[in-house]
Every structure is written in structure tokens, then in C-alpha cells.
């Protein structure tokens, strides 16, 4: 068994560890069970989760067993981490639906067959907890003074932190304890914003079970300016093809800044590090070849080789003028009766933008093009004159294209 710790370290995933030497030794000697938590607040994972999926896959390839914990119980409270407002509570039915969607997406790069990975829902043990017993067994081990120093709570104290949310750390710590008892799970992994919650679980297991437990956080996927990657004009970059088409997904990675290519190749592809270094060393116009490889590899992981190939062909057709391949571009279909309406209305109706206000915002910023002409008029009406042989071409920014076909 290769030591996955060295792989994770070389590729730059690791941010913080509870016990560095012990963790390296453990991962090299034994096959362990570890877990990562997923908050089921949407019916699709997004690029922010993709990094966690990659870490799970690297660990599994090295012989360790991933446990994907879906927060069906904690999701009914909401995690205050990184939030300035309290989250909306969800129904059991919404959470269950989202859990099923997550498993399908995780299965793209994680093998759930023959117990090689499992998915569990913390609603199974949290929803039937006896409050008095929970306070006596778990609450007694948590210091309020210490909890208040955690970053996730500090930012909320000024605005007001409900007791409901204050319980989140206890529940996440209890999750780790339950997984340790049921599945001999000895390590929790998560984004660096989860550090305080992970420490709470590690400490709880050591106190309750007198056993060793470990925690590891990894870097968040940020660009060279320190901003989280995976945001587009239309919102989050989703892994669900119905929310973000494979073409849009491909184009996002094809258009990353030169300074971000090396980091993305390391963190979100399985390319060997020698190949990552070779591609990252390309300069000038040649860096575009590295971006094409990045876009293809990431799209292939999430949407499969066939969709990645289609997206690649569509992108090349657009810049090479090969109209017959434009069918792979995100395309919306409208009726002739939909013409003679405001462009912003049409864009919202075709779901090219989540709302009219988003479309107006981009027009104001000078980033929206209709048939390659910049749109400056908020009240532009789309008529038959705008319909070309290939349809109506919409461009957002420099390289994000959509097509509207009139039937």
C-alpha cells in the first residue's frame, strides 16, 4: 500500500493536521476508515465539494475506506461556519432527495461497491437523541469559553448566534464519535473552515473512548487572488449537468487564469505530477494547451469521456468557425412567438441567467454580447433580424457562449 499522505502532501492538499507524524505512520501501515461530511442544502454538489471528492478518491486508491456522511440531522439546524446569517431549515423529504443526488455524483469517482465506500446519514442517530442524555454524555465535555474562541462562532457573535446553531459543534463532534463506535472511523477530513469542528470530534473520542482519533483539513480551491473558484455569472459551478452543462463546465476550466493552471492540475486531476509539472512549465500561447488538458480531464471525471469530448469539439468549433459542431454548445429552444420580447426577459426564460437582474447587471458591466455585438441597451428587443443560420448567439464575458434556436 503506497502512503497516500505523501501523495496528498506533494499535490498540495493538506492544510492542517492534528498529529502529523502519527497520521503519516497510520496511513502507511493500516487500512483505515475516514469520513468527510456533506451538508445537504442543495440537490447537487458543486466545485467546492469537488476537492473533497478528489481527496476521498486518492485515499480510496491507497486502500482506505471513505465514509461520506450526509448531514440529514445537522442539515435541519444549519452550519454557522462561514455564514453571517442563519440558514433556512429544510424538510426531511428535501434532505433525503438531496442525499440520493449526492451519492450518484460521488459515485463518479468513488467506488461504493462491496463496502469499499459507504454513505451514511447522521439523521439516523441525531433525530432520536434524548436531550438530557445528550447533555450528560456529550455536553459535559465541551467548554463554552473554548467554543466561543472558534472562528466559526466569532463572526456570528456580533450579529447574534442562536442556541440552535451553537449546538452544531457538539453534533458534529458526536457524529465522529458515532462513526468511530459503529465503523471504527479514526479520521475526519474537511475543508480548512471545519478545523474547529474537527478538533472537537477528535477531542471527544479521546475523552469518551480513550482512543486515538485524527483530523486533517485541506486547502480550499481558490484562485491566485485568494477568491474561491467555481463561481460564474450564473452562480455556482454545479456537478449536475442539468444545472451546469458539460460545455459550460469545460469552458470554465478552459478559461482559468494562467497563474491558476498548475494548482488546478495538481488538485482536481489525477494526472501524474511529472505531467503536471511539464504542463505547468508551458509559457505564452502554449499555456492554452495545458488549459485544454485541464478542462478535458476535469470534465471527464464529472461528466464522462463522451461529454468531455463533445464539450471540447464544441469549444474548438466556436473558435474555428465549424458550425456543424455547435450542437454540443448549451442550447435553448424557443418558439417564434417568443421573439419581439426584451432580451433580458428571453435570457431569464431560457435560464441562461438565473434572473433578469443578473442579465441587467452584466449588460451594465459591458460583458454581454448578442451575435458578437456588445449589448448596451437594457431595453433591447430581440426580433427576427437577430436570428442567424446558427440561431441567436449569446456571449457572457470573453468565452462563455450559449445558443438560442428558434423553432
From Swiss-Prot:
Domain S4 RNA-binding, chain residue ranges per copy: 341-405
EC number: 6.1.1.1
Location (main, coarse): cytoplasm
Transmembrane segments annotated in the record for this chain: none
Gene3D superfamilies: HUPs, RNA-binding S4 domain, Tyrosyl-Transfer RNA Synthetase
Keyword flag Amino-acid biosynthesis: no
Motif extent ('KMSKS' region): 228-232
Cellular compartments annotated: Cytoplasm
Recorded family membership: Belongs to the class-I aminoacyl-tRNA synthetase family. TyrS type 1 subfamily.
Positions of short motif 'HIGH' region: 40-49
Source organism (scientific name): Clostridium botulinum (strain Okra / Type B1)
MF annotations from Gene Ontology: ATP binding; RNA binding; tyrosine-tRNA ligase activity
Chain sites annotated for binding L-tyrosine: 35, 168, 172
GO cellular component: cytosol
Superkingdom classification of source: Bacteria
Subunit details: Homodimer.
List of residues binding ATP: 231
GO BP of this protein: tyrosyl-tRNA aminoacylation
Family annotation (Pfam families): SYY_C-terminal, tRNA-synt_1b
Name of encoding gene: tyrS
CDD domains xrefs: S4, TyrRS_core
UniProt KW Nucleotide-binding keyword: yes
Function, in words: Catalyzes the attachment of tyrosine to tRNA(Tyr) in a two-step reaction: tyrosine is first activated by ATP to form Tyr-AMP and then transferred to the acceptor end of tRNA(Tyr).
UniProt enzyme class: ligase
Keywords: Aminoacyl-tRNA synthetase, ATP-binding, Cytoplasm, Ligase, Nucleotide-binding, Protein biosynthesis, RNA-binding
Chemical reaction(s) catalysed: tRNA(Tyr) + L-tyrosine + ATP = L-tyrosyl-tRNA(Tyr) + AMP + diphosphate + H(+)
Protein name according to UniProt: Tyrosine--tRNA ligase
Amino acid at each position: 500500500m503506497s502512503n497516500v499522505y505523501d501523495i496528498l502532501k506533494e499535490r498540495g492538499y493538506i492544510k492542517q493536521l492534528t498529529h502529523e507524524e502519527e497520521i503519516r505512520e497510520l496511513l502507511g501501515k493500516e487500512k483505515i476508515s475516514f469520513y468527510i461530511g456533506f451538508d445537504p442544502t442543495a440537490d447537487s454538489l458543486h466545485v467546492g465539494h469537488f476537492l473533497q471528492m478528489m481527496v476521498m478518491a486518492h485515499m480510496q486508491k491507497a486502500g482506505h475506506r471513505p465514509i461520506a456522511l450526509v448531514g440529514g440531522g445537522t442539515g435541519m439546524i444549519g452550519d454557522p461556519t462561514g455564514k453571517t446569517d442563519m440558514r433556512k431549515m429544510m424538510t426531511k423529504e428535501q434532505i433525503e432527495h438531496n442525499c440520493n443526488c449526492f451519492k450518484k455524483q460521488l459515485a463518479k469517482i468513488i467506488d461504493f461497491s462491496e463496502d469499499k465506500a459507504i454513505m451514511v446519514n447522521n439523521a439516523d442517530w441525531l433525530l432520536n437523541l434524548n436531550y438530557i442524555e445528550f447533555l450528560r454524555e456529550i455536553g459535559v465535555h465541551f467548554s463554552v469559553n473554548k467554543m466561543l474562541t472558534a472562528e466559526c462562532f466569532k463572526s456570528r457573535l456580533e450579529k447574534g448566534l442562536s442556541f440552535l446553531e451553537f449546538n452544531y459543534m457538539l453534533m458534529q463532534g458526536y457524529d465522529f464519535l458515532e462513526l468511530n463506535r459503529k465503523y471504527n472511523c479514526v479520521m475526519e477530513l474537511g475543508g480548512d473552515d471545519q478545523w474547529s469542528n474537527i478538533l472537537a470530534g477528535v477531542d471527544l473520542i479521546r475523552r469518551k473512548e480513550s482512543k486515538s482519533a485524527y483530523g486533517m483539513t485541506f486547502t480550499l480551491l481558490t484562485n491566485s487572488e485568494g477568491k474561491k473558484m467555481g463561481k460564474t455569472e450564473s452562480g455556482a459551478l454545479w456537478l449536475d449537468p442539468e444545472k451546469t452543462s458539460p460545455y459550460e463546465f469545460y469552458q470554465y476550466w478552459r478559461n482559468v487564469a494562467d497563474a491558476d493552471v498548475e494548482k488546478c492540475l495538481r488538485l482536481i486531476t489525477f494526472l501524474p505530477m511529472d505531467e503536471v509539472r511539464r504542463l505547468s512549465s508551458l509559457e505564452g500561447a502554449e499555456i492554452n494547451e495545458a488549459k485544454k488538458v485541464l478542462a478535458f480531464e476535469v470534465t471527464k471525471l464529472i461528466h464522462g469521456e463522451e461529454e468531455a469530448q463533445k464539450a471540447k469539439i464544441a469549444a474548438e468549433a466556436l473558435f474555428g468557425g465549424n458550425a456543424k459542431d455547435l450542437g454540443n454548445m448549451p442550447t435553448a429552444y424557443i418558439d417564434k412567438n417568443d421573439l419581439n420580447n426584451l432580451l433580458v426577459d428571453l435570457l431569464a426564460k431560457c435560464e441562461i441567467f438565473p434572473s433578469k437582474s443578473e442579465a441587467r447587471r452584466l449588460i451594465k458591466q459591458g460583458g454581454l454580447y448578442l451575435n458578437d455585438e456588445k449589448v448596451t441597451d437594457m431595453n433591447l428587443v430581440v426580433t427576427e433580424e437577430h436570428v442567424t443560420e446558427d440561431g441567436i448567439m449569446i456571449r457572457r464575458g470573453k468565452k462563455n457562449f450559449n445558443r438560442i434556436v428558434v423553432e
